[in-house]
């Protein structure tokens, strides 16, 4: 039986008038605001600043129909359970990356629409007309959607860079998004091949498969390195731990799987961080070899020191 001391009895008695004076329901007066993420994170890579920008999120039902089309339901459920994520629902992130080289502001991809990327940039203290270069990793709508809006180009003073094979493919594809978002800017584009240089310290690397000319981009400054991995892996568990699982959006599924193994094999071997467009925000981490694939290790404070 609990023992009531004289001191605890006095404290309880003192609290009674306060409790009586509170209106009914006062404890629930603050409305719930819902789950939220920050709009940006900024870190250092040698002499560069790297800012990830959350341009949007989108929940998805039946994720196996997107991220594991050749996996059995049992295997998909088992891997999901092992990683503490639901089997029947997922959350997709859309995360462009801004690199400040000290001389230029280089933006990788633009999100679904101008509103998402400009809002994230504003939170990071950057205006759209400050962007010097926009690099497009590939031409899917969630990467080119922020290029233009009703008022014209979002990044009025920028020049544009993308892969030659990617631009060539979409130029003849009759794609509405490409024709409306990219073609009007064609005279401002520079096309690069594997090994091409955007500016000093930013180099193109072919990772074809997700699209016919999908590229990743290697950053290096002051002896530090990072990979902008774009859509090489579309999910931090299903695509990384099982690189052979097919993704609905991959144009060439065998080539995409080979690209995942090649790119993340290099990232893991060299122990360098990467930014992945659809990774959980802030969308940066490391790839650790694990069985047939890789385990995503979220970035901590390594680039804050």
Model-derived features with residue positions:
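Histidine-centered catalytic micro-motifs
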Residues: 134-144, 208-214, 276-281
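Cap/insert and terminal regions of metallo-dependent hydrolase folds
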Residues: 3-5, 223-305
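N-terminal secretory signal peptides and thylakoid transit peptides that target proteins
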Residues: 1-20
């Amino acid at each position: 039986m609990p023992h009531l001391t004289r001191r605890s009895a006095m404290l309880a008695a003192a609290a009674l008038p306060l409790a009586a004076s509170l209106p009914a329901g006062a404890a629930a007066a603050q409305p719930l605001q819902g789950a939220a993420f920050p709009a940006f994170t900024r870190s250092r890579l040698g002499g560069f600043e790297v800012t990830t920008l959350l341009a949007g999120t989108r929940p998805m039902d039946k994720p196996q129909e997107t991220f594991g089309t050749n996996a059995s339901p049992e295997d998909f459920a088992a891997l999901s359970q092992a990683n503490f994520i639901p089997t029947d629902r997922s959350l997709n992130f859309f995360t462009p990356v801004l690199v400040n080289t000290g001389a230029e502001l280089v933006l990788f991809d633009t999100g679904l629409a101008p509103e998402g990327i400009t809002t994230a940039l504003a939170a990071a203290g950057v205006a759209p007309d400050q962007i010097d270069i926009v690099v497009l990793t590939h031409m899917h709508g969630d990467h080119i959607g922020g290029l233009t809006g009703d008022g014209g180009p979002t990044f009025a003073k920028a020049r544009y860079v993308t892969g030659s094979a990617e631009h060539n493919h979409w130029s003849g594809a009759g794609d509405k998004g490409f024709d409306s978002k990219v073609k009007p800017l064609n005279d401002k584009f520079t096309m690069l091949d594997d090994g091409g240089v955007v500016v000093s310290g930013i180099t193109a690397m072919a990772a074809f498969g997700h699209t016919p000319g999908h590229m990743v981009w290697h950053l290096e400054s002051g002896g530090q390195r990072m990979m902008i991995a774009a859509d090489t892996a579309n999910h931090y568990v299903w695509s990384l731990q099982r690189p052979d699982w097919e993704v609905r959006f991959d144009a060439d599924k065998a080539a995409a799987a080979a690209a995942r193994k090649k790119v993340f094999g290099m990232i893991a071997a060299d122990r360098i961080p990467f930014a992945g467009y659809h990774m959980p925000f802030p969308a940066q981490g490391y790839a650790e070899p694990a069985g047939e694939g890789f385990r995503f290790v979220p970035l901590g404070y390594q680039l804050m020191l």
